[in-house]
Amino acid sequence: MNAVDPNRAGRVVFGWNSVRIVVPTMLLASLLAAAAWTIHWPVVGDAPLLHYVVFLIDHGRVPYKDIVEIDMPGTYALQWAAIHWLGPGGGGWRVFDFGLMAAAMAAMIAMTWPEDWLGGFFGGALFALIHFRDGPTHTGQRDLMMAVMTLIACAWLMYAVRQKRVWAAGVFGLFAGVAATVKPSGVLFGAVLAALLWLRLRELKLAKAPYMIASTVGFAIPVIACGLYLVHQGALGAFVAVMRGIAAYHASLGRPSLPVLIVGSFPTVLLTVAIPALALLVLEKTWKRWEVQVMLACIVMGATSYIIQGKGFPYHRYPEEAFLALLCGALLVGGMRATGYRRVIAVAGLLAGALYLAPSSAAIARGYDWHDQEFQQMLTADLTQLGGARLDGKVQCFEMAAECQNTLYNMKLVEATGYMYDCYLFQPQQTPVSLKYREDFWEALHANPPQVLVVTDQECFKQARNFGLAGRWPQFQHYLESEYTLAAQRTPPHTLGWWRHPAVPFSYQLYVRRQP
């Protein structure tokens, strides 16, 4: 990508060699430190739920049909690959997370290579460090997978145009298709990038049909593969029903206001490098160049994806953060070959990223208390005492992500039903979709009554802890009180350090089915 005038590319700039030594050295040191400080992070947050879905699939359950869960088939496929190729525990998951970061950096370097690899390295390093500073609950997130797949797609897109390779357009489409099978908003990226490809081909007076056909075929491959898998499993109808029903209902819950989402969509963590980079974008008029337009379009699509998802979670910004970090790297490194105050702006931005943002992010990543596994340890001890392996198929969790299913995963216990979340069962305002979910769960519960129920105090999308959720469904409350006995209630003694600010630990109640 030519982020600056090619006529200035060979100009000798005072201090450039020093910056080329200091910036990558500090970035690399911060990356290595962060990797060393986070390599022992366990599988926590959303990842255990998806690990458990893969575990259930391996034990004969079919997604959407037997496992009522709202994630996309591509997510399960990548999660399955990580578990089976790298290992089922925390070590394998860290390797997968590091691998995603390495792939993101490689794609960024490929995109900036024609001018200077350092721009891609700068962007990739900052993106990785921002990801690490978000903490252990953000490892391997679906938006991270989508962001990395889109970065790789863009790298092949630029290669296809630069080298005039039709087959590379097919590879672009392939990775864009994978992104779309991970998160529905991946379709936005694919569509916008295809439009930019068409416009660039028209500008270069190249035949558009071969490139567009190749990219469309590439995009279709992972989409069709997922469809064929669902058809083979007899789950295509169930998938459509879940997406139209409970997934859409999930999207309506816990939504901040639109102004809050719009403000929150900008990754303020990157301000120290974004301000000088965006100044250069205007001063150097690099926004006119096609490669920069690709990055800007992906930034806009990333913000759009964040707003559409409507939860305000930090990891929903990953696609936007990835491309913004890349753009900053390309513009700041390119700006080093400018003159006067523009070069000063570029140097300031590069040093701010390398000397402040990178090491501070690594230090924040170090500060998480990842050792806390008290919930799992306590629940494992209780379930072992109640039968251990004999509880296979006879235990049911009521949670959203409070570590109950993570415990079952580590104990290799299959749940009694395929219903993963209690979030939709106990909403204060029920809808036809959630009432249908209740009805189906009720039927599954009575088809295979669990011997043990684990009820957590987690209330989805809220920080408060609440054991009174069952009271919102009187029929279930009566069933719980008449058919089960409260055997134990446990609260871990220490706060959870998985987030920037320690949180109240999750508690659980253990109910045992009464003997007839």
Identify the residue ranges that each predicted region occupies.
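Perimembrane helix-loop-helix junctions
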Residues: N2-N7, R11, F189-A220, L281-T286, ...
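Loop-to-helix entry region of an early transmembrane alpha helix in multi-pass inner-membrane enzymes
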Residues: P73, A77, L86-A103
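Transmembrane-helix motifs of polytopic, lipid-linked glycan transferases
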Residues: V95-L118, I152
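Transmembrane-helix signature of polytopic, membrane-embedded enzymes
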Residues: M108-I130, A147-V148, V161-W167, Q293
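Membrane-interface transmembrane helices that cradle and orient dolichyl/undecaprenyl
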Residues: W113-P114, L118, A153-V171, E203, ...
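Membrane-interface alpha helices of multi-pass inner-membrane proteins
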Residues: W167-P184, F189-L196, I221, I299-I308
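Short periplasmic/luminal acceptor-recognition loop of GT-C membrane glycosyltransferases, typified by
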Residues: V187, Q373-T431, L435-R465, T491-T495, ...
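Hydrophobic/aromatic-rich transmembrane helices and adjacent perimembrane loops
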Residues: L188, Q309-R343
